[in-house]
From Swiss-Prot:
Name of this chain's protein: UPF0597 protein Cphy_1256
Domain of life of the source: Bacteria
Family: Belongs to the UPF0597 family.
Molecular functions (GO terms): L-cysteine desulfhydrase activity
PANTHER family according to UniProt: UPF0597 PROTEIN YHAM
Transmembrane region(s): none
Biological process annotations from GO: L-cysteine catabolic process to pyruvate
Length: 417
């Protein structure tokens, strides 16, 4: 089981440059250009509603200020390197950017709504005379399921709900996660977690220093002061400020999301520093926070109308409770307290206001932690709270997957009209 847990961390905690939905579009486009082997005359991108929602209003990385599906597809075509996966746009040059802007102005890229049961689904088609290519990406941000050249399928693969199909999420439960975090040889996971600390702290500090979006992170510190409870919210919010508004620094993601990767890690890091605990304890707390978030999202799915900052913040709260010396019952109660409070936050796409939602979710997690450390918490029958942690999480999964299905459709309609 321990090896499977380590495999999950290795598969999930990977670097990504910029918001992952436009990156996924750029990746599919770069791959389609590679398959075609020449500059196309026509480019068409078909996207599921959740991809449209998450790519519509966020700045595409490496483009400075370009937003939207067309920009992501064109810059991926012109300057992307599909071999770099989630860092596909690290090769983009100024010349590539100028050509992207020129093609955008001509209406070169056509976009279509893709009728599909999948939340994460992209099809990119290119044509050059009689030649054509097609790349289909489904379920995960790097999950290329089908490639066609001149109408002939050259590659086809069944995609699992994780970028690494060998990963087994069935081992995850709150109890198994806590057992693993307490007993694993920390040296086996240290490089993964220290990279998360390094990358995510760096972009958070960038978001605090400079102007990105509405600067939720720095505003929190300016108005409320430099207290750990404020820093724990301000750091991930600042990272999101930067990431949603074109910052080119990479982030270590969680569950396919940079915002969730920052939400799940930075509050734990800040409380660890304030409590002056040993580095190893911070790393073990990060194991808990990351895996609790992954556990929830592995059931909910990568994209949903349910805001992923909530599941990430619940994980962060669990990690913070661990840092305070909380026992298993208190960690369980922290997760329950968080989910009882903010499970109603909806996802209306990737954009500047994600930073504010992160701050709200982390605030709820901090409150949840302090309540649980006092031996208190919301009880079975308090709304969606059930009599066990497992049943409570199962209920939230049902809420996110089934209850919010129509919510998701209505959100997309509002955004597009």
């Amino acid at each position: 089981m321990y090896k499977k847990m380590i495999d999950i961390l290795k598969a999930e905690l990977v670097p990504a440059l910029g918001c992952t939905e436009p990156i996924a579009i750029a990746l599919a486009s770069a791959k389609a250009r590679e398959v075609l082997g020449e500059m196309p005359d026509e480019l068409t991108v078909e996207c599921s509603s959740n991809i449209i929602k998450n790519a519509k209003s966020v700045v595409v990385p490496m483009t400075k200020n370009l937003k939207g599906i067309e920009a992501a597809a064109i810059v991926g075509l012109i300057g992307g390197d599909a071999n770099k996966k989630l860092e596909v746009l690290t090769t983009v040059t100024e010349e590539d950017l100028e050509e992207t802007k020129r093609l955008l102005a001509t209406g070169f890229c056509q976009t279509k709504f893709l009728q599909t049961t999948e939340k994460l689904h992209i099809i990119v088609r290119m044509k050059k005379g009689e030649n054509s290519s097609l790349v289909e990406l489904v379920k995960t941000h790097t999950g290329i399921a089908r490639i066609e050249k001149d109408g002939v399928v050259t590659f086809e693969e069944e995609i699992e709900d994780c970028d690494d199909s060998t990963v087994d999420y069935s081992v995850l439960s709150v109890a198994s996660i806590l057992d693993f975090a307490n007993q694993v040889d920390i040296e086996e996971v240290r490089p993964i977690l220290e990279r998360q600390i390094e990358y995510n702290t760096k972009i958070a500090k960038e978001g605090l220093r400079n102007t990105y979006g509405v600067n939720v992170g720095s505003t929190l510190l300016d108005v409320y002061g430099d207290d750990v409870k404020i820093r724990a919210k301000a750091m991930p919010a600042a990272g999101s400020d930067a990431r949603m508004n074109g910052c080119e620094l990479p982030v270590i993601i969680n569950s396919g999301s940079g915002n969730q990767g920052m939400t799940v890690s930075l509050p734990v890091i800040e409380f660890g520093k304030m409590l002056d605990v040993e580095d190893e304890k911070i790393l073990r707390a990060l194991i808990i926070s990351n895996l609790i978030a992954i556990y929830q999202k592995s059931e909910i799915g990568r994209l949903s109308a349910y805001c992923g900052a909530v599941s990430a913040a619940a994980g962060a709260g669990a990690g913070i409770t661990y840092l305070y010396g909380g026992n298993e019952e208190q960690i369980n109660q922290t997760i329950i307290n968080t989910l009882a409070n903010v499970s109603g936050i909806v996802c209306d796409g990737a954009k500047s206001s994600c930073a504010a939602k992160i701050a709200s979710a982390v605030d709820a997690a901090i409150v949840a932690t302090m309540i649980s450390l006092k031996g208190k918490g919301f009880l079975s029958g308090d709304g969606i709270v059930k009599d066990t942690i497992q049943k409570t999480i199962d209920g939230v999964v049902t809420l996110a997957k089934e209850g919010m299905q129509e919510t998701d459709e209505v959100i997309v309609k509002i955004m597009l009209n």
